[in-house]
Each structure stands twice: as C-alpha cells, then as structure tokens.
Regions:
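Periplasmic solute-binding protein
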Residues: 1, 33-55, 144-153
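Glycine-centered hinge/linker elements that transmit conformational signals in sensory
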Residues: 4-13, 41-45, 49-89
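Short helices/loops that flank or line small-molecule/ion binding pockets
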Residues: 8-13, 91-106
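Pocket-flanking alpha-helical
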Residues: 9-19, 113-116
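Acidic, glycine-anchored loop motifs typical of Ca2+
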Residues: 17-28, 136-137
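Beta->alpha turn/N-cap motifs
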Residues: 35-38, 108-113
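Extracytoplasmic/periplasmic substrate-recognition and gating elements
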Residues: 116-172
Length: 172
C-alpha cells in the first residue's frame, strides 16, 4: 500500500554508500532528494488543510487536535528518516544527480518534469503517499513558491488599482 510508512521505509532502503567511504554525499545514492518543505508537503498529502469552512466562514484549522497529532507524527518521522534524505533547494544540482541514479525518489513540483527531458533515463511519477490506510484519496500539494495567490477583499475601495498593481508585480 502506498502510504507514508511504506514510502519512508523505501527511502531508508534507498541509501547506498556507492563509493564505500562511509560518508554520504553527491557520490552516493540517497533515498530521497527533496526541498526543505518535505514536512509541509507530507501534511498536504494527508488531505487536511490549514483552513476550514465553518457555516460559510473560513477559520484556521491548524490548532485542531487531529491536525496537531498528524503534524507531530510527520515531524517525528521526517527527523527519524532525515539521515536517508538529501534536503536541498539546489534543483539545478539535484536533477542531474537524480537522472544519474543518485536517489531512489525525488519529490518536486510538476513544473520540473520538463527539465528531465534532457536526460535519458526511465522515471515514474507517483502521487505523494497517503498518510495511512484510513485515507480515501491521494492528495497533492501546490507549492507556494511556484504558485502564488493573491486576493482582493470584496469590500476593497480600490479593486481596479489593486488589480493593476498585482498585474504589474506578476509581469516578467
């Protein structure tokens, strides 16, 4: 079953000291390449949200006991499995290393799939694992660094000016 514990066990099994020097670096095979947002991404995969709707009103849901229990469990597991994980924001280094077989898994936003085209290697695409067997659906995350949302309050006095400013800020 594709659940968090199975995934992390596979991550642990993916660590191999390829050069036999007892040190794990880019010359070895890791269980997982990932950005520092792993815990957040695993939380999103549980299907829970930081906000909830209560009679049509949005409220913060992070303080609910189930959310706190899940976040605590994910945090504990990420810390326990951290030795098998290469955490880096340097995707320009990670992608060629992944293509060369230096990691069993690479968790990244789908935008980066096109960057794999320049390499000749077989790759599969998996959803983030379910938290446990009680979860009905697989849930994916939208990375805040790649997709930025901005809202204009319905009672804004200057919505057109705000829209022009947002448009200008998002221009390349």
């Amino acid at each position: 079953k594709w659940v968090l514990d199975t995934f992390l066990d596979m991550v642990a099994g993916g660590l191999v000291d390829l050069n036999g020097d007892g040190q794990y670096d880019d010359n070895d095979q890791w269980g997982l390449f990932v950005q520092p947002t792993l815990g957040q991404n695993l939380f999103y995969a549980t299907g829970n949200s930081f906000i909830a709707k209560d009679n049509g009103t949005l409220k913060i849901a992070m303080g609910e006991e189930r959310h706190l229990d899940i976040m605590s469990d994910i945090s504990d597991k990420v810390l326990r499995f951290k030795p098998y994980i290469n955490i880096s924001n340097d995707y320009q280094a990670m992608i060629p290393l992944f293509a060369d077989g230096h990691s069993l898994f690479y968790s990244e936003v789908s935008l980066f799939i096109e960057r794999f085209r320049q390499y000749e290697f077989d790759v599969g695409i998996l959803p983030m694992p379910k938290y446990d067997l009680n979860q009905d659906d697989y849930c994916q995350f939208a990375d805040g660094g790649c997709i930025s949302l901005a809202g204009i309050p319905i009672d804004s006095k200057y919505p057109d000016d705000t829209a022009i400013l947002l448009d200008a800020l998002s221009a390349e």
